[in-house]
C-alpha cells in the first residue's frame, strides 16, 4: 500500500513509539463490550491494539485516504468508521456510556475539548494525547501561571490528570512541541452546579479576558464589588486567583438577582 504522507492541514503527527502506545492502551483499560470512540485513528497505532481487545471500535476520521486504508486492515470488520470532521460529529448518536480516546489534532484541540464537555454526562472517561502546554493549562490549580479559562471550564466537568509525558521523537513527523496524555473523568458530584451554564461560561470568559486586570475591572459589566464580596471574592484579586467553584457561586448569585 502506498505510504501515507502526513497532512499539515489536518494537524497529522503519527504516533510510532510502541512503549507510549502500550501505556495509552493500558490506561484506557478496554473491555470487550465497552463503547469506545477513537478520534483521529491515523495509521492505526492505537487503533490496532484497541481493536484486539474490543468487539467493536468506533473511529472518527476526516482524511479520506486514511479512511480507505482503515477499510483494508485485517481487523476492519471490528471498525465502525465515521468519516468527517470531529467538530461536527454527533457523539450522542452513539448509544451507551462511552470511552473516548485519541491523538488529537493540536490545531483544533481547544474547541474540540469544549465540544466534548457537552457530552460529559454520557462519558465513562477520556484519554487524549495533546500538546503538553495545553494539558498543563487543563489541570492547573488557581494561583498558577497556567490556570485560566480552559482549566476553569473543563474542571467544572472533569477530574483530570496528566498521565504520560511524550517527547517529539515519539511521532512521525516530529512536532515542534512536547506532548502529554491526559485522563479526563466526568465529576460525579460537582462542588457547585451552574444554574445558567451560558451565563457561567460568559462570566468566565470575561474574567480572563485581560489577565493583568483585577476581577473588578474584567467583570464590571456583570458584577459590582458587593456582588463579588457576597460570594467571598476579593474585588482586587485577579482571575487566576479564583477557584472554579467561586465562579459558579458568582454566576448563580448574579442569576438569582435577575427578576
Curated annotation (Swiss-Prot):
Q: What does this protein do?
A: Specifically dimethylates two adjacent adenosines (A1518 and A1519) in the loop of a conserved hairpin near the 3'-end of 16S rRNA in the 30S particle. May play a critical role in biogenesis of 30S subunits.
- What is the name listed in the Swiss-Prot or TrEMBL entry for this protein? Ribosomal RNA small subunit methyltransferase A
Question: Which residues are S-adenosyl-L-methionine-binding?
Answer: 13, 15, 40, 61, 85, 103
Q: Give a GO molecular function annotation for the protein.
A: 16S rRNA (adenine(1518)-N(6)/adenine(1519)-N(6))-dimethyltransferase activity
* Keyword annotations from UniProtKB, A to Z: Cytoplasm, Methyltransferase, RNA-binding, rRNA processing, S-adenosyl-L-methionine, Transferase
GO BP annotation list: rRNA methylation
Give the UniProt subcellular location, in the record's own words.
Answer: Cytoplasm
Record-linked PANTHER family: DIMETHYLADENOSINE TRANSFERASE, DIMETHYLADENOSINE TRANSFERASE-RELATED
Identify the enzyme class: transferase
Cross-referenced SMART domains, in alphabetical order?
A: rADc
Predominant localisation class: cytoplasm
Record family assignment: Belongs to the class I-like SAM-binding methyltransferase superfamily. rRNA adenine N(6)-methyltransferase family. RsmA subfamily.
Give the NCBIfam families listed for this entry: ksgA
Which catalytic reaction applies to this protein? adenosine(1518)/adenosine(1519) in 16S rRNA + 4 S-adenosyl-L-methionine = N(6)-dimethyladenosine(1518)/N(6)-dimethyladenosine(1519) in 16S rRNA + 4 S-adenosyl-L-homocysteine + 4 H(+)
An example Gene Ontology cellular component term from the record? Answer: cytosol
Give its E.C. classification number: 2.1.1.182
Amino acid at each position: 500500500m502506498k505510504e501515507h504522507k502526513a497532512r499539515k492541514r489536518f494537524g497529522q503527527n503519527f504516533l510510532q513509539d510502541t512503549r507510549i502506545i502500550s501505556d495509552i492502551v493500558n490506561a484506557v483499560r478496554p473491555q470487550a463490550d465497552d463503547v469506545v470512540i477513537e478520534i483521529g485513528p491515523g495509521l492505526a497505532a492505537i487503533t490496532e491494539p484497541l481493536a484486539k481487545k474490543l468487539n467493536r471500535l468506533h473511529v472518527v476520521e476526516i482524511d479520506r485516504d486514511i479512511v480507505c486504508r482503515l477499510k483494508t486492515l485485517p481487523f476492519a470488520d471490528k471498525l465502525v468508521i465515521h468519516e468527517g470532521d470531529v467538530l461536527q460529529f454527533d457523539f450522542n448518536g452513539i448509544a451507551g456510556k462511552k470511552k473516548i480516546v485519541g491523538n488529537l489534532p493540536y490545531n483544533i484541540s481547544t474547541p474540540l475539548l469544549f465540544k466534548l464537555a457537552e457530552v460529559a454526562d454520557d462519558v465513562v472517561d477520556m484519554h487524549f494525547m495533546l500538546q503538553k502546554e495545553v494539558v498543563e493549562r487543563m489541570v492547573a490549580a488557581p494561583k498558577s501561571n497556567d490556570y485560566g479559562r480552559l482549566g476553569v471550564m473543563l474542571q467544572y466537568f472533569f477530574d483530570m490528570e496528566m498521565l504520560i509525558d511524550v517527547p517529539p521523537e515519539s511521532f512521525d513527523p516530529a512536532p515542534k512541541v512536547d506532548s502529554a496524555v491526559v485522563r479526563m473523568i466526568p465529576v460525579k458530584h460537582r462542588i457547585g452546579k451552574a444554574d445558567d451554564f451560558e451565563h457561567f461560561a460568559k462570566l468566565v470568559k470575561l474574567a480572563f479576558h485581560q489577565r493583568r486586570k483585577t476581577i473588578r475591572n474584567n467583570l464590571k459589566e456583570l458584577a459590582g464589588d458587593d456582588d463579588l464580596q457576597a460570594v467571598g471574592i476579593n474585588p482586587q484579586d485577579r482571575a487566576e486567583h479564583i477557584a472554579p467553584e467561586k465562579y459558579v457561586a458568582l454566576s448563580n448569585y448574579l442569576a438569582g438577582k435577575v427578576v
